[in-house]
């Protein structure tokens, strides 16, 4: 099938198809490097030290005019396909994506968006991948199917596969002839990936591994030809002892011994294929080890960390469509002889949805822009923050939209209840938001701990100079010192109309850095067990990154004269003010003796409930005698 034959109905469609085909040729003629290794320091990690690293963040990343023109030409036919060819209601009701729809997705090249051109893919940058994700998000089941295939299913081959593995597997995966799945989760191991029980045993002749075990909730599990599978293997440690360590494998269905259960009947994303996958004496050649034997945990984390940023642009695309649909309803629906749009509580909901969409979009494209830079930084924390913020905002905004729509939002005749069902999974997959908050906080604290080790040792030992310096800092802070981290005082970095918000960001970052030092001094290594503390640290950091993203983006929009940049100023300032006060409250909660800190009460209440495994308060109608 020709790549764009689906658009060839009539002269206009034919012209669109021709334009899109030219774009595709340009894409495949130009080589784009897909970065696969981490190099320079993360922007987010520096926030833990009270620093704002401007490089790569200010000004907001831009794509070239040529790239922008190309991607915009590609966007048109893709939007046309999703608007006219994809029946999301049917996909949801029937619980599967029709074969002809899958075929058209393949013909569009959507199964190889980030596969390098030399292996038959489009080789698009992270930013272009994010832009296409906005459109693909028009259908959640398709979004999940494509993401499971390339963001995690085949991503390991791109990141750590050797040349032979890439040449063998990527061409058919990029064309969609083969579909990929990522097999990590097991019945007894969800977030605790290291506890998997699937085992791969090396054969006596050392030519292959024998794979046995079961994986659950595998997206594309019933469709896939190629699986990235994680299993325990015996590894000889440096001291000569034998230990079980996780190893990643490329497994073909044709290797045999692979079966899958029936598709799961799910709450949302019902058209995606999710099922159990079982491996029974599956013989995997040693050449199909992905990365190093025993290095599977690192491979899994690199795969998951690399793609999370795209959830921000995908959810933003969904929310923009949702705002458009609900705004039309609010402006035409009358109650009390007035349009719904005239009521303050309805207006508040639209402001919230617009703000959330703007922030997540800014965070996603800031992250993709950093990833696309030469010598790009480690953006694993940033990508995780985008995922947490956008998934929670999606759930909140769709819920608010249903509130605007009233009964209509609850009916299956309209798409809104489906959007609510589809949104719920976002908080769970690609790492639950609880686990990601721990990852965000602990990764940054580990970085700060390495930098501050000597200072913390001096404070613990009572070094007079260090102690007096710390007391002096706290005294200056208590007197309301002016914080200048190079944003609010430099109009070349942040536009003056955003100056007050920039100052709020600087102040938050400064005191966050101080608080991090205090937490490391107070808890030391035991901080890994302080999940309520870590949650607050992560929440502050997510807000700081969101503030940074909107200030950088809005400043760029003002300077280059983008339309409606005054609207961006409103959204950016509104978010920064709200985030600033949220951060102040969270910072106060991190003080063990502050009245805002209810950690001990929270732990005691939950302990009493879980001991009885029940709600233990007496019924309000009960009597003591």
Curated annotation (Swiss-Prot):
InterPro entries: ACAD9/ACADV-like_C (IPR049448), Acyl-CoA_DH_CS (IPR006089), Acyl-CoA_Oxase/DH_mid-dom (IPR006091), Acyl-CoA_Oxase/DH_mid-dom_sf (IPR046373), AcylCo_DH-like_C (IPR036250), AcylCo_DH/oxidase_C (IPR009075), AcylCoA_DH/ox_N (IPR013786), AcylCoA_DH/ox_N_sf (IPR037069). Signal peptide: none annotated. One of its GO terms (biological process) is long-chain fatty acid metabolic process. The modification N6-acetyllysine is found at residues 45, 525. The lineage of its organism: Eukaryota, Metazoa, Chordata, Craniata, Vertebrata. It catalyses: eicosanoyl-CoA + oxidized [electron-transfer flavoprotein] + H(+) = (2E)-eicosenoyl-CoA + reduced [electron-transfer flavoprotein]; octadecanoyl-CoA + oxidized [electron-transfer flavoprotein] + H(+) = (2E)-octadecenoyl-CoA + reduced [electron-transfer flavoprotein]; oxidized [electron-transfer flavoprotein] + hexadecanoyl-CoA + H(+) = (2E)-hexadecenoyl-CoA + reduced [electron-transfer flavoprotein]; decanoyl-CoA + oxidized [electron-transfer flavoprotein] + H(+) = (2E)-decenoyl-CoA + reduced [electron-transfer flavoprotein]. The modification Phosphothreonine is found at residue 482. This is Complex I assembly factor ACAD9, mitochondrial. Belongs to the acyl-CoA dehydrogenase family. Keywords: Acetylation, FAD, Flavoprotein, Membrane, Mitochondrion, Mitochondrion inner membrane, Oxidoreductase, Phosphoprotein, Transit peptide.
């Amino acid at each position: 099938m020709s790549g764009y034959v689906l658009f060839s109905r009539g002269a206009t469609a034919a012209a669109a198809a021709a334009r899109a085909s030219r774009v595709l040729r340009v894409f495949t003629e130009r080589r784009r490097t897909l970065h696969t290794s981490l190099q320079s320091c993360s922007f987010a990690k520096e926030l833990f030290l009270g620093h704002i690293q401007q490089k790569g963040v200010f000004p907001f990343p831009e794509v070239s005019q040529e790239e922008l023109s190309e991607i915009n030409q590609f966007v048109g036919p893709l939007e046309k396909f999703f608007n006219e060819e994809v029946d999301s209601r049917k996909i949801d009701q029937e619980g599967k994506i029709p074969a002809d729809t899958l075929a058209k997705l393949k013909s569009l090249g959507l199964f190889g968006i980030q596969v390098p051109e030399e292996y038959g893919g489009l080789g698009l940058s992270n930013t272009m991948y994010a832009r296409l994700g906005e459109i693909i998000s028009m259908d959640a089941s398709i979004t999940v199917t494509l993401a499971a295939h390339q963001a995690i299913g085949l991503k390991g081959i791109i990141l750590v596969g050797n040349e032979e593995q890439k040449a063998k597997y990527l061409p058919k995966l990029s064309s969609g002839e083969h579909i990929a799945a990522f097999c990590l989760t097991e019945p007894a191991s969800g977030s605790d990936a290291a506890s998997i029980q699937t085992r791969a045993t090396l054969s006596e002749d050392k030519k292959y591994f024998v794979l046995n075990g079961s994986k659950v909730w595998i997206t594309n599990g019933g469709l896939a030809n190629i699986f990235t599978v994680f299993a325990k293997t015996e590894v000889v440690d440096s001291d000569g002892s034998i230990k079980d360590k996780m190893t990643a494998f490329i497994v073909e269905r044709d290797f045999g011994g692979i079966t899958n259960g029936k598709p799961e009947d799910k709450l949302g994303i019902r058209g995606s294929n999710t099922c159990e996958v079982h491996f029974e004496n599956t013989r995997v050649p040693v050449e199909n080890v992905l990365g190093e034997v025993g290095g599977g945990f690192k491979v899994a984390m690199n795969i998951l960390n690399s793609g999370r940023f795209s959830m921000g642009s995908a959810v933003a695309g969904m929310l923009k469509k949702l705002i458009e649909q609900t705004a039309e309803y609010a402006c035409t629906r009358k109650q009390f002889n007035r349009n719904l749009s005239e009521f303050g509580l309805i207006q508040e909901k639209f402001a919230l949805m617009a703000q959330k969409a703007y922030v997540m979009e800014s965070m996603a494209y800031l992250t993709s822009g950093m990833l696309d830079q030469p010598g790009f930084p480690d953006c694993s924390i940033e990508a995780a923050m985008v995922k947490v913020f956008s998934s929670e905002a999606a759930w909140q905004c769709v819920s608010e939209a249903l509130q605007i729509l009233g009964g209509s939002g609850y009916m299956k005749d309209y798409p809104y209840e489906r959007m609510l069902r589809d949104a719920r999974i976002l908080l769970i997959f690609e790492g639950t938001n609880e686990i990601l908050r721990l990852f965000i906080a602990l990764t940054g604290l580990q970085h700060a701990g390495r930098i501050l080790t000597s200072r913390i040792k001096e404070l613990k030992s009572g070094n007079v100079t260090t102690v007096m310096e710390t007391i002096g800092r706290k005294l200056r802070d208590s007197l309301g010192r002016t914080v200048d981290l190079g944003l609010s005082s430099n109009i070349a970095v942040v536009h003056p109309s955003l100056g007050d918000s920039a100052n709020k960001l600087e102040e938050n970052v400064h005191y966050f850095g101080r608080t991090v030092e205090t937490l490391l001094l107070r808890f030391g290594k035991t901080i890994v067990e302080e999940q309520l503390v870590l949650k607050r640290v992560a929440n502050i950091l997510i807000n700081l990154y969101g503030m940074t993203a909107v200030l950088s983006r809005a400043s760029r929009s003002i300077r280059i004269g983008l339309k409606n940049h005054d609207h961006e100023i409103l959204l950016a300032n509104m978010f920064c003010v709200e985030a600033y006060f949220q951060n102040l409250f969270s910072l106060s909660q991190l003080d063990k003796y502050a009245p805002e800190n209810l950690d001990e009460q929270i732990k005691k209440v939950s302990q009493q409930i879980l001991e009885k495994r029940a709600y233990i308060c007496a019924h309000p109608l009960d009597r003591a005698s």
